[in-house]
């Protein structure tokens, strides 16, 4: 879906067209989920934050301005919701006892992730992982990522290339280890 098509759907949603929301959801859910996963690295949290992002989209659609970057707007909502949730969870977990963690455990899907995703989680920082996910998985252009993140295009390209080099090195190291 192009930015212009998404912009039109956002405007339809502003006017109360419920079918526009369904189309927005169906056309953006895969990329948005991958983006959220790159931030929180937990499947259940990503599902929850995706729901939160779409709820906030609906409740704040009146703030959307025609012609602005709808993808950047939606991804910013998702990013802010996810970061807020992670910060809230950190505060809560700081007050929980070690026994609770040992008793109930925590869920991690690292074992179920692809080797590339595991390598991303292992060697990339949050910003690098975000850029790689937005470009390689969600299909955004470097210019669009720069708009979304508020970084210069050159910095986005440099971070992307640097992240790819780290991933390549890590995957080669893992491949050598297996052979």
What would you call each of these model-derived segments?
Residues 3, 84, 91-121, 141:
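Internal acidic/polar
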Residues 34, 48-55, 68-80, 158:
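Structural recognition of an alpha-helix C-terminal capping motif at a helix-to-coil junction
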Residues 14-15, 41, 52-69, 88-89:
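Sigma70-family region 2
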Residues 59-66, 76-96:
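Arg/Lys-rich amphipathic alpha helix in sigma70-family domain 2
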Residues 131-135:
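A short pre-motif secondary-structure segment
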Residues 1-31, 122, 147-149, 169, ...:
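N-terminal module of bacterial RNA polymerase sigma factors
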């Amino acid at each position: 879906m192009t930015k212009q098509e998404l912009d039109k759907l956002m405007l339809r949603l502003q006017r109360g067209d419920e079918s526009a929301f369904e189309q927005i959801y169906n056309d953006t859910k895969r990329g948005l989920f991958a983006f959220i996963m790159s931030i929180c690295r937990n499947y259940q949290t990503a599902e929850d934050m995706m729901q939160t992002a779409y709820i906030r989209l609906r409740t704040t659609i009146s703030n959307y301005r025609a012609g602005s970057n709808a993808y950047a707007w939606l991804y910013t909502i998702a990013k802010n919701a996810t970061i807020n949730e992670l910060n809230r969870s950190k505060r809560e977990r700081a007050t929980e006892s070690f026994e609770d963690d040992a008793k109930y455990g925590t869920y991690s899907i690292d074992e179920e992730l692809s080797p590339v995703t595991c390598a991303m989680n292992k060697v990339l920082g949050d910003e690098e992982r975000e850029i790689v996910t937005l470009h390689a998985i969600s299909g955004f252009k470097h210019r669009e990522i720069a708009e979304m993140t508020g970084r210069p295009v050159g910095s986005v390209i440099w971070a992307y290339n640097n992240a790819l080099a780290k991933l390549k090195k890590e995957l080669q190291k893992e491949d050598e280890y297996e052979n």
